[in-house]
């Protein structure tokens, strides 16, 4: 399989200049700072973008009149997202629970630009799948043998060339 060139499948849309940045995380309540999230907020503010830090614990979603809104605990107004103007950044903590990954699927269903997609997160979380995917695109990979039983690890090692 050969990777297509970017210009073959992507083009830049007109820039309306105003986007919304949604950062999805689940940090402990006692965490006083969210270093990466704070930096993202600073950059969004510099660009004049609206920003929302959505915490999965205690958070919920609504869809009034078809529009998707994310709400943190005690936030009745929430934050409306759409595929037209929202960029969602998925923090690593979200990947700790499969049920939390459903928010990524929901955003993708609403055509929101998600960094990283559920598929990307899934592939990257699995070292072997990552190696297979990279090999599909011609990226050289070390010889790999799957070891399903630790007792046979020496035998598998002996077969590496």
Question: Where on the chain are the PLM-derived regions?
Answer:
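ATP-binding N-terminal substructure of ATP-dependent carboxylate-amine bond-forming enzymes
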Residues: 2-115, 120
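Active-site nucleotide/adenylate-binding loops and adjacent lid/helix of ATP-dependent enzymes
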Residues: 21-26, 82-83, 110-111, 118-161
